[in-house]
């Protein structure tokens, strides 16, 4: 296992104007970024970063800074597979030449971090790429964008960083992997930390969710304990239906059966046959009840894969006219999937989960949760319930969104009723 340095060392180095190396989860980008605070940018730091990275230097910023500077999204519909929120590129209006030199880019970076800067201080497009970080940082999204802003804040600096991916010195056509990053960090006396460790550090020192109430909920699948939560970063409420003793026989919270279910009014409440959400929720409750120990976490604010109820109905309207579920979202100027699972991960940790068997047919959900220090030991498939109304939707999820849904090609619309089974 690669030796990592402490978060405390990384924060101290950031405060001192040094760069650090930050690695993410191997199931995500599996890359290491050089990171330093934007307000500490110098020509020397920028030149060092350009020398050892791809050279595509980005400046992660807190959302309020992006708003103040009028930094709009680079593209109306974010199609980046990791949800990196690129904004329009910029250069400083004053004090630079072409904008591309290390000195020019350092000037632009410092100006982006300056609390007194305004939108008119920049020209667009430019040679520096600002990124909009999620509110809540790595506790909401386990990315380098959020890690850079978190490290700057923890160092007592403005919420602005500079990042770029480190290129392998062995194979310049590839990105450096963990073992090589350790060698690189040692050669240049840089701290090497992981986003997972930063998440764990923040989780120990901060809390962004609040447990509000608990009550007994008898259901047709048996009795559950309903635990209600709020989050300071979201104006929504979430509820976890808990069965049994989550700590388990060894008191360690391992091997818990978990379903993280996205709110779906039409499917869960109205019984809509356009999706498979209602049957998935019912199956998850039944499976947890049979297990005698587990959690069904009901995530509010995830309606329509995070786009909201009205947008979801608009997407349905487009689907009625022939679009599939992905293209309908994109036509509305919305991402195919806008959900994040950071709050859900915090709730699971608060409930005592440390490792879990995740009930899902969506491999992306595993990646969305795995970066938060929650060890997913198994992905447990849910039954697929296809019918004439949702078969095209399910095939789109399989073919365009990577969901693990087998057997759909055997569905026969001429046969009444539902088709499916465990996958």
From Swiss-Prot:
- Stated name of the protein: Riboflavin biosynthesis protein RibBA
- Biological source species: Mycolicibacterium gilvum (strain PYR-GCK) (Mycobacterium gilvum (strain PYR-GCK))
- Where are the active-site residues found? 337 (proton acceptor), 339 (nucleophile)
Tagged with keyword Manganese: yes
What's one GO BP annotation on this UniProt entry?
A: riboflavin biosynthetic process
Q: Please state the gene responsible for encoding this protein.
A: ribBA
Q: Which cofactor does it need?
A: Mg(2+); Mn(2+); Zn(2+)
GO terms of molecular function? 3,4-dihydroxy-2-butanone-4-phosphate synthase activity; GTP binding; GTP cyclohydrolase II activity; magnesium ion binding; manganese ion binding; zinc ion binding
What superkingdom does the record give?
Answer: Bacteria
Q: Which CDD domains match?
A: GTP_cyclohydro2 (cd00641)
Positions with a binding annotation for Mg(2+) 2: 29, 144
Residues that bind D-ribulose 5-phosphate: 28-29, 33, 141-145, 165
Region DHBP synthase, residue ranges? 1-204
């Amino acid at each position: 296992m690669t030796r990592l340095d402490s978060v405390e060392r990384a924060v101290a180095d950031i405060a001192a104007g040094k760069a650090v190396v930050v690695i993410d989860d191997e199931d995500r980008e599996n890359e290491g970024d050089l990171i330093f605070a934007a307000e500490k940018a110098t020509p020397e730091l920028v030149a060092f970063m350009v020398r050892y990275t791809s050279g595509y230097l980005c400046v992660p910023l807190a959302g309020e800074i992006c708003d103040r500077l009028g930094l709009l999204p680079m593209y109306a519909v974010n199609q980046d597979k990791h949800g990196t929120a690129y904004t329009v590129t910029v250069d400083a209006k004053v004090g630079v030449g072409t904008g591309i030199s290390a000195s020019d880019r350092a000037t632009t970076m410092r100006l982006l971090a300056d609390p007194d800067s305004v939108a008119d201080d920049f020209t667009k497009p430019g040679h520096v790429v600002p990124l909009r970080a999620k509110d809540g940082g790595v506790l909401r999204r386990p990315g380098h964008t959020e890690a850079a802003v978190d490290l700057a804040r923890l160092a007592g600096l403005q919420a602005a960083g500079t990042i770029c991916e480190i290129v392998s010195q062995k194979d310049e056509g590839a990105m450096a992997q963990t073992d090589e990053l350790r060698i690189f960090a040692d050669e240049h006396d840089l701290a090497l930390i992981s986003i997972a460790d930063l998440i764990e550090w923040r989780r120990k020192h901060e809390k962004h969710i609040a447990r509000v109430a608990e009550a007994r909920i008898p259901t047709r699948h048996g009795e559950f304990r309903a635990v209600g939560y709020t989050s300071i970063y979201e104006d929504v409420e979430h509820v976890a239906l808990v069965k049994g003793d989550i700590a388990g026989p060894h008191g360690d919270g391992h091997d818990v059966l978990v379903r993280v279910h996205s709110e779906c009014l039409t499917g869960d409440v109205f019984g809509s046959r356009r999706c498979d959400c209602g049957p998935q929720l019912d199956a998850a409750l039944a499976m947890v009840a049979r297990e005698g120990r587990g959690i069904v976490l009901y995530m509010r604010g995830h309606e329509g894969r995070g786009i909201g109820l009205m947008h979801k109905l608009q997407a349905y309207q487009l689907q009625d006219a022939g679009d599939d579920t992905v293209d309908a979202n994109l036509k509305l100027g919305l991402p195919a999937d806008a959900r994040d699972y950071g709050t859900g991960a915090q709730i699971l940790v608060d409930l005592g989960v440390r490792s879990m068997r995740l009930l899902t047919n969506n491999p992306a959900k595993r990646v969305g949760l795995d970066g938060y220090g929650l060890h997913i030991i198994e992905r447990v498939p849910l039954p697929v319930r296809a019918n004439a109304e949702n078969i095209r939707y399910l095939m789109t999820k399989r073919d365009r969104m990577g969901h693990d849904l087998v057997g759909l090609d055997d569905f026969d619309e001429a046969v009444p009723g539902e088709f499916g089974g465990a996958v």
